[in-house]
Amino acid sequence: MNFVQYKNGNYDVFIDLDSGTKIRKNDLDFFEANTVESMDIKITNCCNMGCPMCHENSTPDGKHGDILSPSFLDNLHPYTELAIGGGNPLEHPNIDEFLKRCKERKFICNITVNQKHFIENYNKIKNWVDNKLVYGVGVSFYRTSNKLIELMQTIPNSVLHVIAGLIELNDLNFMANNNLKILILGYKQVRRGKDLYNNYSMHNMINYNIDTLRYYIKHIIKDKWFNVVSFDNLAIKQLDIKNILSEDQWNEFYMGDDGQDGEQTSASMFVDMVERKFAKNSCAPEDERYDLLDNVEDMYNFLKNRNNE
């Protein structure tokens, strides 16, 4: 274990840099943050995959964000977790320099890439991990692949990302029992994701797959198909995860509301460096994305106060 520690509001945060495990601790019965612990940060809208469910409408000629000029990033506290994505973040011409600067400031950088790009750029990504420029690698599932399993097994902090509604049980079964970690994301009805969902045949398929996964998820967890099974807040809601956990388990594992249903108690947010906007999460519609401010505390408190009104 390789824990780092800092204080956020009325509690202490402990992060194991080796496993990615995070622990919040205080002697009270509630956590009150005063800044972000983690941030989804979109650095480019460029991607050649053309995924029909893409909630960012990324395209091959999508713009890159300015990630090197002075900004709020210069004032983030050490050990802030950055989940770097896009688009395809590997396309950004300044990503190497950006990661070096983040390491100097002791940020914990994780990167999310499509399965195809992960396999094609494995050596580059593995080098980032070996040099502690990147700690975690999220791999967005595309199709079942023995090659994918083989490469992910060489990066202990790699996590398979799948989308409820698009992932099928047979695909999960293929990837299971290979010492992998998995993150299940909720289906986002945003931009192309909304268009896809509104297609009648896809609408029925997505709902069927969500219903199927909701039924089998307790067995997937109990039978240890994956070393770690985690969820974003949207998947927690769509799959009714709270219903399969005891109250003690829920209180132990749940990291807080992200503002989808009003209240925001999590210490996270979304930043679009391409459009220079921030929001409570990446599900936020255009009218709930706001112009970047000079420091992250102001942005976090703006979102927190707005969502708690």
Walk through the language-model features, giving the residues of each.
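N-terminal [4Fe-4S]-dependent radical SAM core
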Residues: M1-D40, W250-E252
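Canonical Radical SAM [4Fe-4S] cluster-binding loop centered on the CxxxCxxC motif
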Residues: L28-L68
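Core AdoMet radical
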Residues: S38, N57-I67, Y79-H92, C102-N121, ...
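Residue-level recognition of short loop/turn positions
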Residues: G50, G86, V274-E275
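Short amphipathic alpha-helix with an adjacent loop that forms part of the alpha/beta core around
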Residues: L73-N75, Y122-V129, L172-N173
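Cysteine/selenocysteine-centered motifs that mediate thiol-based redox chemistry or coordinate metal-sulfur cofactors
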Residues: Y300-E309
